[in-house]
Amino acid sequence: MSVVGLDVGSQSCYIAVARAGGIETIANEFSDRCTPSVISFGSKNRTIGVAAKNQQITHANNTVSNFKRFHGRAFNDPFIQKEKENLSYDLVPLKNGGVGIKVMYMGEEHLFSVEQITAMLLTKLKETAENSLKKPVTDCVISVPSFFTDAERRSVLDAAQIVGLNCLRLMNDMTAVALNYGIYKQDLPSLDEKPRIVVFVDMGHSAFQVSACAFNKGKLKVLGTAFDPFLGGKNFDEKLVEHFCAEFKTKYKLDAKSKIRALLRLYQECEKLKKLMSSNSTDLPLNIECFMNDKDVSGKMNRSQFEELCAELLQKIEVPLYSLLEQTHLKVEDVSAVEIVGGATRIPAVKERIAKFFGKDISTTLNADEAVARGCALQCAILSPAFKVREFSVTDAVPFPISLIWNHDSEDTEGVHEVFSRNHAAPFSKVLTFLRRGPFELEAFYSDPQGVPYPEAKIGRFVVQNVSAQKDGEKSRVKVKVRVNTHGIFTISTASMVEKVPTEENEMSSEADMECLNQRPPENPDTDKNVQQDNSEAGTQPQVQTDAQQTSQSPPSPELTSEENKIPDADKANEKKVDQPPEAKKPKIKVVNVELPIEANLVWQLGKDLLNMYIETEGKMIMQDKLEKERNDAKNAVEEYVYEFRDKLCGPYEKFICEQDHQNFLRLLTETEDWLYEEGEDQAKQAYVDKLEELMKIGTPVKVRFQEAEERPKMFEELGQRLQHYAKIAADFRNKDEKYNHIDESEMKKVEKSVNEVMEWMNNVMNAQAKKSLDQDPVVRAQEIKTKIKELNNTCEPVVTQPKPKIESPKLERTPNGPNIDKKEEDLEDKNNFGAEPPHQNGECYPNEKNSVNMDLD
């Protein structure tokens, strides 16, 4: 079972896997642990990652990058319209109103959704992980920014489903970093002590995120998060690009923005310059050859100029930091440490601003690039039964407050209730009770639209169906369970209607009593169990009680308040119903919970038909990529064979082919090379396979003759040594050598016979081989000689290595007063005289042992 964590960023991705030795960040086929989030489309296949980034300038219109923020957004979204101006590829609306990416693929114009593009990137990451782990990858944990809304998270899950990944959890970036930080800490305070507060700051390529986390031993709780979704390393690059565009326009009369390739080159050079300025404060040059119109351009900048240029961006850093402290009611003095991650935090001015705000040195103990991926892998290991991980509970926070709105039964007024406040513990479930006579709708939305970086505050509309009044005409109690799950997605998971069924008194047996008791708890204890179960995971049980108290005391919605007040009193009401009938002698009431279907109409969710179509399309593209790779491998094999033999035919292989064949083969190699770059440039795989077989028919015998000429003498030498060895042993046997006088003569004759036969065979083949020229096929191959050596050893070695039989010395009879043989016997006799009973060795004893002193020899 695979355990993989995927950090899917706007600019690059990282893959971390859990192994027996711990968490490891793995490298791709270019031995780079960083895989660019870039997909390039060609006439035959797709290229993803490093290879795609290398084509970004030459194939700008068909290379897609910086698409992460397009998830779950409509084409008319203001953010999409703004970003569209800076992209090298085209964005168009899809039929469902989403963002479509138009590219040329396989010689045709294609429209891909953002989910499909992300699925392509995940395909590459999955392939890289499988190549490293040597087994299929299915389960994983994927990171998302903490400010991603419900629609954006659902879109990422759809992308994972397209590629066949089972995403166990969508994990917030900052939560993953906190887990990676806390699980290895051995000095955390115990559960009954005050938690340690650590602030994590992450500035990546496109966003700035901060979070405050409370740590106890084996426990992590996210207290709050804050962010600026539009502040990242990309914005600093844009400042440099704007500066040099203006400079080049004045200095060289060149408008870099008029040509996308020139602009992309300038972006790449400005990014390099930004990184260099992080470690150098002196003036640094920027030089680009043949920038536009065959003109070379140059410029320079130092760190102080860069900081002055980005002063507006640097001022924005403090805004999320203030917001975080305000949300969590923390003071700067409460923060024990400040950890920074993310590539853009390497900018010295960014570090200085953060350190100045908190009034303490910032810590860089975590890997700035890989911390998120490692945290995701740890979370995946915790969720996986295949790994045993130290117990560590993770409680996340809801980034935006979520409310429900509904229409009152038989009334036009609407009821509103905030079910999850900002920074509420997650995952978490709550149960609401409604009094209804028929089906009703609930609409979920974000309570604070201004604080959500998404134009649509609505989450979805949920219709609770099959609701009916009680048989006596009273309203039915409908219990609705709302939940923010492990992915941070809001959902109405279940709905049930409490139905009262009257029963006859004579039918109320003891079994019915038990049934009544068993049916009643789902009304209240089941609710408590669900909430408590989630609370126990989240570790915030008192918060639910507080929320219930606040809800019961708040006057905005009388209907909901009265209903929620009924939940704690349900047991009392039921007790009255159970206790009263015997007094009044009325029919017994049995309470039954009826599950109700829920129809969900979400702001963003791919339909099953569309999702299946995307899965099928991705499968076809994966197969096409595989076929194209095999075709290219076959073509490269032909090209490699041509170059290899052309060099060796004029070198080591020259003696092993006759002159006429030599000239013909060289001519064929040249013709093949010309064919590869002309009509063979774009052929089917089988054409290259056939061409390689044609070359190998001539080249393989030459290569074999060369290899045989290298190996054959070594094998003959080894065979000669073995023959000489066994022949000498046979001669020593004939000369009555004591070493071999124990060997039977008939067996030694077998050795002599085998030696003579093999020696005769060797002489014959050596004489025959000597008559052959090097350009002719050998009489005998090295493998045949090796087989003869093995046969000779199998025949002779068991005979000549027979051990001599052991000669036993005669046993001497002992008399009671006989002399001692050696000191060891004397020691044993002394021990026996002191009353020690000697042990018998191997069950042997001397014939007169019973009549003599007890004595034994070791």
From Swiss-Prot:
InterPro entries: ATPase_NBD, Heat_shock_70_CS, HSP70_C_sf, HSP70_peptide-bd_sf, Hsp_70_fam, HSPH1_NBD
One BP annotation, GO: positive regulation of NK T cell activation
Keywords (A to Z) from UniProt: Acetylation, ATP-binding, Cytoplasm, Nucleotide-binding, Phosphoprotein, Stress response
Residues with the N6-acetyllysine modification: 471
Modified residues (N-acetylserine): 2
Organ and tissue specificity: Highly expressed in testis. Present at lower levels in most brain regions, except cerebellum. Overexpressed in cancer cells.
Cell compartment(s), UniProt: Cytoplasm
Biased composition (Basic and acidic residues): 563-584, 805-814, 821-832
Designated name of the protein: Heat shock protein 105 kDa
Species of origin: Homo sapiens
Lineage, highest ranks first: Eukaryota, Metazoa, Chordata, Craniata, Vertebrata
